[in-house]
Each structure stands twice: as structure tokens, then as C-alpha cells.
Swiss-Prot record:
Name of the protein this chain belongs to: PCI domain-containing protein 2 homolog
Record text on subunit structure and interactions: Component of the nuclear pore complex (NPC)-associated TREX-2/AMEX complex (anchoring and mRNA export complex), composed of e(y)2, xmas and PCID2. Interaction between the TREX-2/AMEX complex and the ORC complex is required for ORC localization to mRNPs, and consequently mRNA export. Within the TREX-2/AMEX-ORC complex, interacts with Orc3 and Orc4. Interacts with sbr/NXF1. Interacts with Moe. Interacts with nudC; required to maintain stability in the cytoplasm.
Domain of life: Eukaryota
Keywords annotated in UniProt: Cytoplasm, Cytoskeleton, Membrane, mRNA transport, Nucleus, Protein transport, Translation regulation, Transport, Ubl conjugation
Biological function: Required for the export of nuclear mRNAs and involved in mRNA trafficking in the cytoplasm. Component of the nuclear pore complex (NPC)-associated TREX-2/AMEX complex (anchoring and mRNA export complex) which functions in docking export-competent ribonucleoprotein particles (mRNPs) to the nuclear entrance of the nuclear pore complex (nuclear basket), thereby enabling the export of mRNAs to the cytoplasm through the nuclear pores.
GO-annotated biological processes: mRNA export from nucleus; poly(A)+ mRNA export from nucleus; post-transcriptional tethering of RNA polymerase II gene DNA at nuclear periphery; protein transport; regulation of translation; transcription elongation by RNA polymerase II
Free-text domain note: PCI domain is required for interaction with polysomes but not the interaction with sbr.
An example Gene Ontology CC term for this record: cytoplasm
Iron-sulfur keyword on record: no
Amino acid sequence: MFGTVNNYLSGVLHAAQDLDGESLATYLSLRDVHVQNHNLYIAQPEKLVDRFLKPPLDEVVSAHLKVLYHLAQEPPGYMEAYTQQSAACGAVVRLLQQLKDENWCLPLMYRVCLDLRYLAQACEKHCQGFTPGHVLEKAADCIMACFRVCAADGRASEEDTKRLGMMNLVNQLFKIYFRINKLHLCKPLIRAIDNCIFKDSFPLPEQITYKYFVGRRAMFDSNYQAAVQYLSYAFSNCPDRFASNKRLILIYLVPVKMLLGYLPSKSLLQRYDLLLFLDLAMAMKAGNVNRFDEIVRDQELVLIRSGIYLLVEKLKFLVYRNLFKKVFVIRKSHQLDMGDFLSALHFVGLTDVSLDETHCIVANLIYDGKIKGYISHAHNKLVVSKQNPFPSVSL
């Protein structure tokens, strides 16, 4: 593609003159076919580029050609390529500032920031000598510089405002912050989107990604109702053809809804190959604590990698609650012997649980609002409320 570097630079120039942000983004993309053109692998392209382009676009293109050069080395110079991509991002910031009342270059910004994140991830994987997450955090700083320019654009009309680029960048930053486990940095970004008058004008794919990450953050903050709201939006609006994305959303939505008392349907879990949750739901419904523990133990790595291990562990309280409710139904009394709960635990396979541990489990269930009542230690009994002693768990 483009044959010579002159043809390539001529194409970049025409895209800029036509205010064609999409084409310009393609010329600067590391995923476009032009990256395979050996004629573009130039270590010092500045003089050549300056003949075609004016600042700061010339800096963006020069840095891009240097990225291609470093990636073509054997082995690839990921760190050098990242450094040049970071320089390209800085030049894009200056370009955004130069184009005061225009937003046609937003696709270019998206592409440069996306490739910066990809290169940062490559550095984290292939390079040594720095703290894990360091390069990604530096990349986030560069992307944040673009975000600030977009967020500060209050002079343009709705059609030309750079604020329409905010959500794309926020999603890029979310992906970094979740990867390096710095979720607290998401809060000001969420506030910025909430306060943006164009928050309903962002493209639907961006809104789906945004709701997915905000839902996950709400989940980690134990704000489960909000998590269900955001994740449900993401799942409902994600097209069916993106089955892998819908499955990813369900990995978080299903356990959160289970924690709120909603059990998933077998057909849904079969469709998205998530039968792990069906096994958990069946054990939970039956109050089979031992079986629940077995499933969690067998799937521990999967749950940890998905970031839902602790959330699934919280479901265990509902398993206890369901088991002890069965004792209440059988005994048909509001004064229940603690020994009956111990026997129930032994019956489902927890043979090493003591009476003292049973007291602790029941006390935690009372504290958590899953049982309405109190423990009479003098009589070794649980006295439950005559009205709704085992409150339903729901929204």
C-alpha cells in the first residue's frame, strides 16, 4: 500500500486538507496494512515529513514512522516504539488545542491513544526493568492529557465539540485502571461523564463499554443495585452477534443478581457457556454448603482470574440462610435449637463444624439482615421473628 513514503505522506496531507479524520486515523494506525510497507521503516523521517506537513501533524506522523521502524527490528523494540507513540500522543494534544472549534480529528486521537495502550501492554509483557503497571500508568497520563483538552472544550457547538470524544478516552482509561488495579482513579472520570451535557449523545458502543466498567466498579464498591442497573444496560444493548462480549458482561451480572436473590435460567447459562453459575445456583437453592464449597474450590482459578472470587464467596451466606430456613420450615417453631442448625450443617457434609462456629454463622446472618431474630445463649436457641423471619433477598 502507498508504495513509496512520498505516496504515503501525500495521502496523509490530502486527508488533513479534507478534514477527513477517519482516513487520517487509518494512516496513523498500527493495524492498517501500511505497517507492512518496508519503505516506511525510517529511523529519522523528520526532514522528509516536514516537506509535506505542518506542525504539529508532522510530529505525529514522524513519531508514527519511528514506531514502525522500532517494531520492525529483531527483536522488536517495544520500549522505543512506546516512547515514540507517547510523543505522537503529545503532538495530538497540541493538534487538538490548535483546532479550537473543530472536532474532525477525534478519530485520529482515538487511534493514537488506542495504539499507545496496546504498546504499553506489549512493554509490560516483553520488557523488564520496571515495576509492573508502570508503563501502562504512564500511558494513562498521556491519554488523560487528551481527555483534559476534550473536557475543557466548552466553546464549540454540539456538532463540533471535542467533548464528544470524552467517553472513548474514559473507556481507554478504565481498561488501564482495571488492569493495574487502580479503580479509585475511575471516580473523577465517572463524575466528568455524569456532568457532561452530551452524555446521552455518545455512540451506543461506547455507552455499552462505559456501563460495563461502571457496573464492575459499582460491584467492587458493594453497590449491587447500581451494578445490576449498569451491567443490565450493557447486556441488553450489546448486539447478539457479539456473543463473547455478552458472555463477559454476564460473568459479573449473574453473580451480582444472585447476591440480590435472582437465580439465572438454565437456558441463559447454557447459551453463553456459563454452567458454573447453574451449579452454584443449585447448591445455593438447596442450602448445600459443602457442594457450594466444592464448586468454588474446583473453579477457584477461573473465579480469581475473572475478579469475582470474593463476590461468589459472599453468596455463601445465602447458602447458609437457605439451609437454616429449611430447619425452620421443618421444625415449625419460632424457637429453634442451635443443635438443629449444627445437625443440618453436618447433614450437608460440613462434619468438622463446631457448635461455637454455628453460633458465629447464625450471628453473622442476623447482623447481615438475612435472619430476623436473636440468639438466646442461656437456652442455646435461635428465637426468630414471627413475621418474615427469613426476609427474601431481592431488589
